[in-house]
């Protein structure tokens, strides 16, 4: 299990809150978060409560100025622990929402669905095993989304409207 400590001010100053699991609304514990330390594990922070909106992946390390790092002053309101001891990874991706278009199956990282599968987009997926990060651009760049086992029928319904995913990576021991 991971451990993260949030601080109200930059450079690890002000009130702090220690977290070791998911938190759907961090404003319950503190009014703002300007810096944090990830002591172990990996975490995904979300810009809105209940794990909605833009996401940012944090691994072990120190983040002394969260607003600068996350760009445009984005604040976050919820956090989810991402470290899970999976050995098997399997996901099906679809070109269109609701099982539409071309389908491809992944068991490992994919730095470009266009190059590997000749797919122009990924709008739906079914994660059967493991935990994954999906990226807006090829080569693991741009906005990202954290996926656990389950069906993701429409990214638009998850607050990710207009997002196109072009690469995906397994969450392994990289934390």
From Swiss-Prot:
Keywords on record: Eye lens protein, Repeat
Pfam families, per database record: Crystall (PF00030)
Source superkingdom: Eukaryota
Domain spans labelled Beta/gamma crystallin 'Greek key': 2-40, 41-86, 89-121, 130-172
GO MF term list: structural constituent of eye lens
Disulfide bond annotation, renumbered to this chain: none
Gene3D superfamilies for this protein: Crystallins
InterPro entries tied to this protein: Beta/Gamma-Crystallin (IPR050252), Beta/gamma_crystallin (IPR001064), G_crystallin-like (IPR011024)
BP term (GO), one: lens development in camera-type eye
Family membership noted in the UniProt record: Belongs to the beta/gamma-crystallin family.
Subunit and partners: Monomer.
PANTHER family, per database record: BETA/GAMMA CRYSTALLIN, CRYSTALLIN, GAMMA M1-RELATED
Domain text: Has a two-domain beta-structure, folded into four very similar Greek key motifs.
Protein purpose: Crystallins are the dominant structural components of the vertebrate eye lens.
Protein name per UniProt: Gamma-crystallin M1
Organism: Chiloscyllium indicum (Slender bamboo shark)
Gene name of the encoded protein: GM1
